[in-house]
């Protein structure tokens, strides 16, 4: 992801409720699980997508922590 895409993603996250953030986190975790499965089977072409999804999950958790305060 490029810097502007990251900023837009975080801006979008900040507009979501806690329930929507939890749903987004679950979707990303499911995608990460699927990507790991593909990587183990040797079918994953975009290996960088693994790290990208991990970082997106971290961003979601950060925004969740910000809004809980």
UniProtKB/Swiss-Prot annotation:
SUPFAM superfamilies: Ribosomal protein L29 (L29p). GO terms for molecular function: structural constituent of ribosome. InterPro entries: Ribosomal_protein_uL29, Ribosomal_uL29, Ribosomal_uL29_CS, Ribosomal_uL29_sf. Pfam families: Ribosomal_L29 (PF00831). The keyword Cell membrane does not apply. GO terms for cellular component: cytosolic large ribosomal subunit. Keywords: Ribonucleoprotein, Ribosomal protein. One of its GO terms (biological process) is translation. It comes from the Bacteria. The keyword Ribonucleoprotein applies. Belongs to the universal ribosomal protein uL29 family. This is Large ribosomal subunit protein uL29. It comes from Streptococcus mutans serotype c (strain ATCC 700610 / UA159). The lineage of its organism: Bacteria, Bacillati, Bacillota, Bacilli, Lactobacillales.
């Amino acid at each position: 992801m490029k810097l502007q895409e990251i900023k837009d993603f975080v801006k979008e996250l900040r507009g979501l409720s806690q329930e929507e953030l939890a749903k987004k986190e679950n979707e990303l975790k499911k995608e990460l699980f699927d990507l790991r499965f593909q990587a183990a089977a040797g079918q994953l072409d975009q290996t960088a997508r693994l790290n990208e999804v991990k970082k997106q999950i971290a961003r979601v958790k950060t925004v969740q922590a910000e809004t809980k305060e």
